[in-house]
């Protein structure tokens, strides 16, 4: 894993954690994020197979336990 990948993973986990701590609906967040990736939104910057992998990474970050 590159330094940048480590940094991005940590950032994603922290953003999701902050959202959860603020009372956000994390399940809805995941659904919405996946829809943005799968639906060719303005926030999608990759093609397959990265689309599927990005959704998998979101799921891993949401389920992260220290």
How does the language model describe each region?
Residues 1-24:
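N-terminal acidic leader/helix
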Residues 29-66:
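Low-complexity intrinsically disordered segments
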């Amino acid at each position: 894993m590159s330094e940048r990948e480590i940094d991005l993973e940590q950032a994603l986990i922290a953003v999701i954690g902050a959202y959860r701590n603020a009372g956000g609906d994390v399940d809805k967040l995941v659904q919405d994020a996946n829809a943005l990736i799968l639906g060719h939104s303005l926030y999608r910057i990759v093609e397959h197979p990265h689309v599927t992998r990005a959704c998998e990474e979101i799921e891993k970050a949401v389920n992260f336990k220290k």
